[in-house]
Amino acid sequence: MFRINVDAGSDFLLVLEELVGKLSTNDIQSIYISDKPNSKGEQANSLCGRSVNDLGFKNGDLLFVTYESTGEPPKTESSAPLTTAKTTNGANVSINMNDISIPINKGPGPLKVDQLPVDGLLDKEEGMIMRPRSDLCRHGDKGMCEYCSPLPPWDKDYRKEKGFKHMSYHAHLNEINESKNNRNNATSYMAPLEEPNYNINLNCPSGSHAPYPKGICSKCQPPVITLQQQQFRMVDHVEYADSTILNKFIDSWRTTGVQRFGILYGRYEQFDKVPLGIKAVVEAIYEPPQSGELDGLTLLPWENERQVDEIAASLGLYKVGMTFTDLTDSGAKNGTVLCKRHKNSYFLSCLEVIMAAKYQVSNPNITKHSNSGRFSSKFVTCVISGGMNGEIEPRSYQVSNSAEALIKADIITGSTQPSMLYINDSEGKRYVPDVFYSKINEYGLEVKTNAKPAFPVEFLLVSLSDSFPLDPSPMFRENFPIENRDFMGDLQDLKSAYNYLNADPGDGSQLFDFHFLTYIAKTGILSHDELKLVLSYVRNKDQTDYLQLVESPGWMTFITILEQSV
């Protein structure tokens, strides 16, 4: 009988880690869990990333485990081992494990999860960097030598030559895979990616002491943290489908002088300027409820967030990032703004780094190359501020996976200096290990510095490039009033919808506006099927969908309401 105590909000990975120590196996990937005694069920690590509560485990539920033995005699207990998880209200969740069997030896491999399409494409590519024949070559046209042979996508000299500060995510993945896994021996597969974890284990696998803070040992405390600038980036480039998208967003500051925040909706595509690169293509900026000020803003509850996400998903789009303005007029009356963010101040403030990390944690990158099915995030942060010459320019960033882990463990917080992050003290159940940051000095030597009480935010930043396409082909038009701009006099109401649709030439082209689509959904006039017709027409541009829509009772009702509102 096994008894494992975890909080209801704890990741199921904590249960598995202790379970593995009690079974005759060290391989989490060989464990399968089912709620039926005669069913193999799901691979256990596919449940990681979700809490015990999210998985729906209740007191008395039985779970059955199947695993591969690593050589030790299998357990032959007639009684079922029992795992209990303690919830926040003190109740125990019983997880009974019976009928443990040894399945046929099956080679492990990557997880079966739904990755983004761009990851599926790049997984199939090696990304080798082709080189032409050089003057140093001493062979014929069909020969190859060290001076012209292809380079791997993670080659440091190539990155230095091209001025790439970071390698791409898939180049990083391939580099680790190359050293960890043998292509000719699939049975020895090891997941190449692993997220850093700076949390103390409140359920020590040794079982020799009470949970922290009443007890602690080397098996449950996190190791010393050494921060250094991340060598790879999850996304290499941010591309706005049309400059109008960004200009319309900045217009709110130009009109009112208050700052603005928006969520970037788009998709991820291959970026051919970087080996195995990824770019975020932004098709729309949705502005959630907020209260803007001259030097900041306050985000308000966003009640229809799920509805907006569902509309975007129906169009093949999803959240790819966030953007906000930090603009101050220079006073020169020539349209220039102050340059506040530069190498001698900061690029993202400490509070913005924390916000970016929280958004990245909320929007994880799903991957088959990690035991947990997750690794970091592709969520980007774009700040619109003043350039060195007083121009308005966007700059795109991400924070490192170490920043995400620091946030999860509640180790960092903001400080009075925007360029510095403060390290919290150990308190209650929060344990903060020693933290250092590492950098290369002017002599090329690595120097470690104690990060307490504060350290520069630059050690958590990853910079991205951004641009507009030379030949734009955006999915949407930006003509309907943007949401939550009532303070500017831009209203999304029946009158504005009537005027907007009245300009339609009759081909449904006015439907190609993300803000109008979210407004239609918010009114609730169209039925679910009728709204699906609208979104299907916008995505596929099939006139059959449009003809069915205009003849539907919901659309006719919508038009009648608009006509009567004028």
Swiss-Prot record:
Q: How does it sit in the membrane?
A: Peripheral membrane protein
Record-linked Pfam families: NPL4, zf-NPL4
Q: Does the keyword Endoplasmic reticulum apply?
A: yes
Q: What is a GO molecular function of this protein?
A: ubiquitin protein ligase binding
The compartments listed are: Cytoplasm, Perinuclear region; Endoplasmic reticulum membrane; Nucleus membrane
The record places domain MPN at 238-375
Per the record, the GO terms for biological process are: mRNA transport; protein transport; ubiquitin-dependent protein catabolic process
Q: Which keywords label this protein?
A: Cytoplasm, Endoplasmic reticulum, Membrane, mRNA transport, Nucleus, Protein transport, Translocation, Transport
The entry's cellular-component GO terms read:
endoplasmic reticulum membrane; nuclear membrane; perinuclear region of cytoplasm
Do the record's keywords include Membrane? yes
Q: Per the similarity annotation, which family is this?
A: Belongs to the NPL4 family.
Q: What does this protein do?
A: Involved in the import of nuclear-targeted proteins into the nucleus and the export of poly(A) RNA out of the nucleus. Has a role in the endoplasmic reticulum-associated degradation (ERAD) pathway.
- Name of the protein this chain belongs to: Nuclear protein localization protein 4
Q: What is the lineage of its organism?
A: Eukaryota, Fungi, Dikarya, Ascomycota, Saccharomycotina
